[in-house]
UniProtKB/Swiss-Prot annotation:
Species name: Haemophilus ducreyi (strain 35000HP / ATCC 700724)
Matching InterPro entries: Auton_GlycylRad_Cofactor (IPR050244), Form_AcTrfase_GR_CS (IPR019777), Gly_radical (IPR001150), Glycyl_radical_cofactor_GrcA (IPR011140)
Protein name as catalogued: Autonomous glycyl radical cofactor
GO terms under cellular component: cytosol
Biological role: Acts as a radical domain for damaged PFL and possibly other radical proteins.
Origin organism lineage: Bacteria, Pseudomonadati, Pseudomonadota, Gammaproteobacteria, Pasteurellales
Aminoacyl-tRNA synthetase listed as a keyword: no
């Protein structure tokens, strides 16, 4: 469990009135705020490095955070390969053909020929 403290007494003047988060399970102290430049904000040290101190507890409200790394992205285009290839050859037949590219809706005919081929290649594969 994490406990918030304000150090009220210490032989080290740089610690007096500083604020820390103590994680007793990890035996770590994280500096929240301190005078001078000995302890930096967000610096983590072992709790015993604080030495003999007196402190008062500070209420800490820790909300769990969701951390997403990587993630997934999906564009859904409900089309046949033949439709897109025909749209390349006969753009006048498909003036309203709209597809999804990187989360945006875009008219297929407004893409460059290279982009159109890229969409077809990425959308239609032989296997996963």
């Amino acid at each position: 469990m994490i406990k918030g403290i304000q150090i009220t007494e210490s032989s080290n003047n740089n610690l007096v009135n500083s604020f820390w988060l103590l994680d007793e399970e990890k035996n770590e102290a994280r500096c929240i705020a301190a005078k001078g430049d000995v302890y930096q904000e967000d610096q983590v040290i072992a709790i015993n490095e604080l030495g003999q101190i007196a402190y008062r507890e500070i209420p800490v409200n820790i909300a769990p955070t969701i951390k997403v790394e990587g993630g997934q992205h999906l564009n859904v285009n409900v089309l046949r390969r033949e439709t897109l290839e025909d749209a390349i050859k006969n753009p006048e037949k498909y003036p309203q053909l709209t597809i999804r590219v990187s989360g945006y809706a875009v008219r297929f005919n407004s893409l460059t020929p290279e982009q159109q081929r890229d969409v077809i290649t990425r959308t239609f594969t032989e296997s996963l």
